[in-house]
Curated annotation (Swiss-Prot):
<comment type="subunit">
    <text>Interacts with FBLN1. Interacts with EGFR and ERBB4.</text>
</comment>
<feature type="compositionally biased region" description="Basic residues">
    <location>
        <begin position="91"/>
        <end position="102"/>
    </location>
</feature>
<dbReference type="GO" id="GO:0008284">
    <property type="term" value="P:positive regulation of cell population proliferation"/>
</dbReference>
<dbReference type="GO" id="GO:0005615">
    <property type="term" value="C:extracellular space"/>
</dbReference>
<dbReference type="GO" id="GO:0051897">
    <property type="term" value="P:positive regulation of phosphatidylinositol 3-kinase/protein kinase B signal transduction"/>
</dbReference>
<dbReference type="GO" id="GO:0048661">
    <property type="term" value="P:positive regulation of smooth muscle cell proliferation"/>
</dbReference>
<keyword id="KW-0339">Growth factor</keyword>
<dbReference type="GO" id="GO:0038135">
    <property type="term" value="P:ERBB2-ERBB4 signaling pathway"/>
</dbReference>
<dbReference type="GO" id="GO:0030307">
    <property type="term" value="P:positive regulation of cell growth"/>
</dbReference>
<dbReference type="GO" id="GO:0008016">
    <property type="term" value="P:regulation of heart contraction"/>
</dbReference>
<dbReference type="GO" id="GO:0007173">
    <property type="term" value="P:epidermal growth factor receptor signaling pathway"/>
</dbReference>
<keyword id="KW-0245">EGF-like domain</keyword>
<dbReference type="Pfam" id="PF00008">
    <property type="entry name" value="EGF"/>
</dbReference>
<keyword id="KW-0964">Secreted</keyword>
<feature type="transmembrane region" description="Helical">
    <location>
        <begin position="161"/>
        <end position="184"/>
    </location>
</feature>
<feature type="disulfide bond">
    <location>
        <begin position="116"/>
        <end position="132"/>
    </location>
</feature>
<feature type="topological domain" description="Cytoplasmic">
    <location>
        <begin position="185"/>
        <end position="208"/>
    </location>
</feature>
């Protein structure tokens, strides 16, 4: 319904323009006829210029039709722009203001930029406090604590058992070596004592 007045107005303007163009051509024809009736002599160059020939008339009619068609095309192709009412302008301003208020800056980017030591900062809008997502191996409110690796009890038990077995074997070897040395020394000392006794006996016998 809003488009109808603008379309009617454009059609009216097109009709007025076509009427003006047609009126000018009719006025020219009337002047030419009046000059011809007042001067019954054969038409001269000036009269020929006033009276349009058949080709000129056809060309004028085609020009008028083309002008009318162009005006009608422009009238139907152009879309009338809606009038900006104060209510629409206010609504547009409110929407722009709302969009500006909705975009809040993340406090983790400025205020709490260095809050998390070993982690990623995340601001909780509901509680209005920053929170940290710690990296693997760290814990704490600000990811400041280092988590030590926990040893496997089974692995610890196996390691201790191996050490104990190695210690027992080494101790046994040491004992065997010590016993062997003692036995070797005892046998060597016993042989030395026998030799000394024999020498003593031989010396006593020779003296007699």
């Amino acid at each position: 319904m809003k488009l109808l007045p603008s379309v009617m107005l454009k059609l009216f303007l097109a009709a007025v323009l076509s009427a003006l163009v047609t009126g000018e051509s009719l006025e020219r024809l009337r002047r030419g006829l009046a000059a011809a009736t007042s001067n019954p002599d054969p038409p001269t160059g000036s009269t020929n210029q006033l009276l349009p020939t058949g080709g000129d008339r056809a060309q004028g009619v085609q020009d008028l039709e083309g002008t009318d068609l162009n005006l009608f095309k422009v009238a139907f192709s152009s879309k009338p722009q809606g009038l900006a009412t104060p209510s629409k302008e206010r609504n547009g301003k409110k929407k722009k203001k709302g969009k500006g208020l909705g975009k809040k800056r993340d406090p983790c980017l400025r205020k709490y930029k260095d809050y998390c030591i070993h982690g990623e900062c995340r601001y909780l809008q509901e509680f209005r406090t920053p929170s940290c997502k710690c990296l693997p191996g760290y814990h704490g409110h600000r990811c400041h604590g280092l988590t030590l690796p926990v040893e496997n009890p089974l692995y610890t038990y196996d390691h201790t058992t191996v050490l104990a077995v190695v210690a027992v074997v080494l101790s046994s070897v040491c004992l065997l070596v010590i016993v062997g040395l003692l036995m070797f020394r005892y046998h060597r000392r016993g042989g030395y004592d026998l030799e000394s006794e024999e020498k003593v006996k031989l010396g006593v016998a020779s003296s007699h």
